[in-house]
Amino acid sequence: METPLKEQENSLESCREHSSSISEVDVPTPESANLEACYNKCYCKRCCYHCQHCFLKKGLGICYEQHRRRTPKKTKANPFPASNNRSLSTRARNRQPKKEKKETVETEVAADLGLGR
């Protein structure tokens, strides 16, 4: 079983391995530090504070990259929509009987009232 100190040393070694893509020579001074790309994916305390870019991105969670917008879900195009597949003559024929039924009902009601009085 390892002692707690050895476990900490092992975690520091793994942290150093993660940050090996960035060398201390490549990091500019804090005064002239511009936010250059940092490919370190470790989120340990040491790696979060090792440069301004990592502090903003990992420590504070601020990311200035352009976010990709989701593409709208593709709707299935129906080649024959239900409302447009009937012709004009079919629509006109379907409407006329409804009007005739209303007129016949009205005439029957009028006839019934006239005979009863």
Curated annotation (Swiss-Prot):
Residues 55-65 are annotated as: Core. Keywords: Activator, Host nucleus, Host-virus interaction, RNA-binding, Transcription, Transcription regulation. InterPro entries: IV_Tat (IPR001831), Tat_dom_sf (IPR036963). Residues 1-27, 68-117 are annotated as: Disordered. A motif (Nuclear localization signal, and RNA-binding (TAR)) lies at residues 66-70. GO terms for cellular component: host cell nucleolus. It is found in: Host nucleus, Host nucleolus. One of its GO terms (biological process) is positive regulation of viral transcription. Residues 1-19 have a biased composition (Basic and acidic residues). Residues 81-91 have a biased composition (Polar residues). One of its GO terms (molecular function) is RNA-binding transcription regulator activity. Pfam families: Tat. Interacts with host CCNT1. Associates with the P-TEFb complex composed at least of Tat, P-TEFb (CDK9 and CCNT1), TAR RNA, RNA Pol II. Interacts with CCNT2; the resulting complex is unable to bind to TAR RNA. Belongs to the lentiviruses Tat family. Transcriptional activator that increases RNA Pol II processivity, thereby increasing the level of full-length viral transcripts. Recognizes a hairpin structure at the 5'-LTR of the nascent viral mRNAs referred to as the transactivation responsive RNA element (TAR) and recruits the cyclin T1-CDK9 complex (P-TEFb complex) that will in turn hyperphosphorylate the RNA polymerase II to allow efficient elongation. The CDK9 component of P-TEFb and other Tat-activated kinases hyperphosphorylate the C-terminus of RNA Pol II that becomes stabilized and much more processive. This is Protein Tat. The lineage of its organism: Viruses, Riboviria, Pararnavirae, Artverviricota, Revtraviricetes. The gene is tat.
